[in-house]
Amino acid sequence: MHGESPIKRRESRKIWVGNVPVGGDAPIAVQSMTNSDTNDVAATVAQINRLEAAGVDIVRVSVPDMDAAEAFGKIKQLVKVPLVADIHFDYKIALRVAELGVDCLRINPGNIGREDRVRAVVDAARDRGIPIRIGVNAGSLEKDLQKKYGEPTPAALVESALRHVEHLERLNFQDFKVSVKASDVFMAVEAYRLLAKEIVQPLHLGITEAGGLRSGTVKSAVGLGMLLAEGIGDTIRISLAADPVEEVKVGYDILKSLHLRSRGINFIACPSCSRQNFDVVKTMNELEGRLEDLLVPLDVAVIGCVVNGPGEAKEAHIGLTGGTPNLIYIDGKPSQKLTNDNLVDELEKLIREKAAEKVEADAAVIARG
């Protein structure tokens, strides 16, 4: 069950957002965005720290005005994770956060203003080694493209993106990534497919304004899953009307399902039925809650009966198959029997022991060079 992904990723140029590589042979980076008031430095720092604990690679922060820019500078000094400043309309805000140490600028060159203003932002980014994200969104296409196409379409999104790409290239700036987001899954997927054929820069994937926790997760998993399975995408952000930490969890779950990133437990569990020999749903809920802190990648199967249990358990690092008593498999081999008494406690202990063993084994491999 565990192993290399069969996906051949699209070749792209590598850029760096702080100390995080994006594109090329780098792992697909997981992003999120704060939803606190940026001027509330303490609240925003606390949220970023929670995101970092959840495993986020990069965090975007909205910077709508100069007061927020000054707050951003304070926030930057208090966190470790790379920060992207989300900026629209006022190019002076971009110049200020560049001075304050931003790791990436998210701009739309089309709404920054005149050529000299875009040039000033690009020069500031180049001088400080700051990459830029061109962020095209179906909800804010240029008026001439709205008139030309009548409505947002994949072709309109791509034309907008290429217009901005050419703009940066005219200024001899190549250190950028691009997104073409829409809330419609088919529109976003087709736009990314078209854009992937046109440029070599890394692609930032997302289904914008996807919805709440459940609906947004489904739409993002469908849309991003299609693209990632085709090898398209270098960094992802799951847009949810929910706690931003959930965006990180969903992002990793999507990548884990495609074997593109490994972090924490990959649970394989049956939906349960009347054949179950223990309460699968309760067991899973307890295990997921208890093991959130575990970052070691492990496959754990929790199957309620012997129909599919042995087969699934043999493919996992640790597998539990319901029976009388229940049977534990470790690395594909029967290991021990457990009754329903203290089942979760015993299983948690075995998983943590296996995780520690894996850490030790990996360290030994590294030590041997």
Curated annotation (Swiss-Prot):
Keyword Cell wall biogenesis/degradation appears in the UniProt entry: no
The metabolic or biological pathway listed in the UniProt record of this protein is: Isoprenoid biosynthesis; isopentenyl diphosphate biosynthesis via DXP pathway; isopentenyl diphosphate from 1-deoxy-D-xylulose 5-phosphate: step 5/6
* Entry-linked InterPro entries: Dihydropteroate_synth-like_sf, IspG_bac, IspG_bac-typ, NO2/SO3_Rdtase_4Fe4S_sf
Would I find 4Fe-4S among this entry's keywords?
Answer: yes
This protein's superkingdom?
Bacteria
Q: What does this protein's UniProt record list under function? A: Converts 2C-methyl-D-erythritol 2,4-cyclodiphosphate (ME-2,4cPP) into 1-hydroxy-2-methyl-2-(E)-butenyl 4-diphosphate.
Q: Which GO terms describe its biological process?
A: isopentenyl diphosphate biosynthetic process, methylerythritol 4-phosphate pathway; terpenoid biosynthetic process
Pfam families hit by this protein = GcpE
Q: What is the similarity comment for this entry?
A: Belongs to the IspG family.
User: What Enzyme Commission number(s) apply to this enzyme?
Assistant: 1.17.7.3
Q: Recall the GO molecular function terms of this protein's record.
A: 4 iron, 4 sulfur cluster binding; 4-hydroxy-3-methylbut-2-en-1-yl diphosphate synthase activity (ferredoxin); 4-hydroxy-3-methylbut-2-enyl-diphosphate synthase activity (flavodoxin); iron ion binding
* Reaction equations catalysed: (2E)-4-hydroxy-3-methylbut-2-enyl diphosphate + oxidized [flavodoxin] + H2O + 2 H(+) = 2-C-methyl-D-erythritol 2,4-cyclic diphosphate + reduced [flavodoxin]
Name of protein: 4-hydroxy-3-methylbut-2-en-1-yl diphosphate synthase (flavodoxin)
Cofactor dependence:
[4Fe-4S] cluster
Q: Which free-text remark accompanies the cofactor? A: Binds 1 [4Fe-4S] cluster.
Q: Which organism is it from?
A: Pseudomonas fluorescens (strain Pf0-1)
HAMAP family for the chain = IspG (MF_00159)
Keywords from the named record: 4Fe-4S, Iron, Iron-sulfur, Isoprene biosynthesis, Metal-binding, Oxidoreductase
Record: residues binding [4Fe-4S] cluster: 270, 273, 305, 312
Which residue ranges traverse the bilayer?
none
From the broadest rank down, the organism's phylogenetic lineage runs:
Bacteria, Pseudomonadati, Pseudomonadota, Gammaproteobacteria, Pseudomonadales
Task: Kindly give the PANTHER family that the UniProt entry links to this protein.
Answer: 4-HYDROXY-3-METHYLBUT-2-EN-1-YL DIPHOSPHATE SYNTHASE, 4-HYDROXY-3-METHYLBUT-2-EN-1-YL DIPHOSPHATE SYNTHASE (FERREDOXIN), CHLOROPLASTIC
